Amino acid sequence: MDRSASMRETLKTYFGYDSFRPLQEEIIRHILNKQDALVLMHTGGGKSICYQLPALLCEGTAVVVSPLISLMKDQVEALLANGIAAGALNSSNDETENVQLRRACVEGRLKLLYISPEKLLAEKDYLLRDMNISLFAIDEAHCISQWGHDFRPEYTQMGVLHQQFPQIPIVALTATADKITREDIVRQLHLNHPRIFISSFDRPNISLTVKRGFQAKEKNKAILEFIHRHGGESGIIYCMSRNKTETVAQMLQKQGIRCGVYHAGLSTQHRDETQNDFINDRIQVVCATIAFGMGIDKSNVRWVIHYNLPKSIESFYQEIGRAGRDGLPSDTVLFYSLGDLILLTKFASESNQQNINLEKLQRMQQYAEADICRRRILLSYFGETTTEDCGNCDVCKNPPQRFDGTVIVQKALSAIARTEQQISIGLLIDILRGNYSAEVTGKGYQELKTFGAGRDIPPRDWQDYLLQMLQLGYFEIAYNENNHLKITSSGSNVLFGRTQAALVVIQHEEAVTRKGKKKKVVIAKELPFGAAGGESQDLFEALRGLRKQLADQEALPAYIVLSDKVLHLLCISRPTTIEEFGEISGIGEHKKKKYGKDFVNLIRQFVE
């Protein structure tokens, strides 16, 4: 059998797919030719198969370096469910397990061994010397670079692999890395003339929405409405601080939403319990800092919310990528405020890589403030261009309309000028709104002519307009002067009537009916691939129930048994024999034999 046929047969037998995704076949051939590679492929794009399939076709064991125990566990469970011999050598195992794993590796009974960078360095002169290693795969390779968004010092020592095992190919894989990070990965791993494979970063199934200027109460209200519209679907809420994860989670729990908390300040046991509860659908939502998610291979996360502005587009892209890994429609929402920008600017200014971190934050700010297709901005950041708008972001769905906002801008700039440019955003809004706050009265600002000049505009709208003014360059924030606002020359031109200012009309989500009642926006939930009707939905729910039952029996996450996408395909195809069941994309030989009878028997009840 030639190599192409062997690759396709292995793909179908173990993973249940009839064809490769873009770049997968090319990458696999390159690795089988014992060549080094750097693979950039978006989350859910099929990175794992790029090294798992070569591992099955080569003699020996593939060693996969992974940063998190949870990520290893997820990958190993998925491989075992596909009938592939795999194991993870890490500190969560007892000594007996690790002894058995070492023996299996030396005897060549494992096709893939997952290992942490620390464990790999400890074993490089012992276990690895005694193994027949087919290839090294460095997962989450951006962790090696100080320019990456998730730098981990222990990864920097991975460069010893090529020195100690020069004949063994190395493939480094990541979902996000800009040019400087890619170059750093290649340099630090000492990759030998590697080929760099970059797949499309486009995730057309993920919708992109930005909400600007929301205060905490408004955010919480909007989040509750969003979660209720999504029914019982799984989602993640990312917060900037540990304290905020706790307060948001408590708010959701009081509303009866099954929600957990995850951040670095919690014990390992607590974090593991939260992660396991989320993976196994015992909780619906996780409120987390950026510490959460890399180890999550959960394919049916349907939404991601950023409570605060992320520090970079890489971080943002990686985190929204945790939604919709199965390719089904998923939603993401980013809340953005000037307070976030000020705090993140302070952090970036105090960091070791001040210039580059400020530049990354500025690009994130440009994304959040954009009035052109957001997906085009994301793709452009990673060096990918497209001539078409996506149609699946808030800008495309509701193109911005502009109006003459000169008077609004003049009111704001006049208030800044009358306080001798010694006020922050919050105090400016208090003055414009006519709020007798302690700071306003303490400085006598209630006597200003502009005090209360903007009381007809709600605080949230002022936040949005001020963000627009900042973006248009009418004022700057002096971060080194207590975040005071400074009028620019462009701002002066508007203030003194030399030029006009166009602002974007603020679009509020809630429409109002003639009777004055708020009308909720309803998200239409449809079965993909053309399935429709109540009967299909009934079958889908029955299949989910059976999947959960089988998963509970094996103590596995439900999506490892079969993904939501496979369940939808079963709803459409409705196989009535085990052979037909095995023809469904995503069902390999092992799953066909293991689960075919149970699922076919259930489907027959709906067909007959």
Which residues are covered by each model-predicted region?
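Short helix-to-turn junction characteristic of helix-turn-helix DNA-binding domains
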Residues: 31, 227, 278, 368, ...
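Accessory DNA-binding and partner-docking regions appended to nucleic-acid-acting proteins
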Residues: 1-7, 356-358, 387-608
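Helicase motor core with emphasis on the C-terminal RecA-like subdomain
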Residues: 3-14, 18-22, 26-48, 56-58, ...
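Short, charged low-complexity linear segments at domain edges
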Residues: 353-382
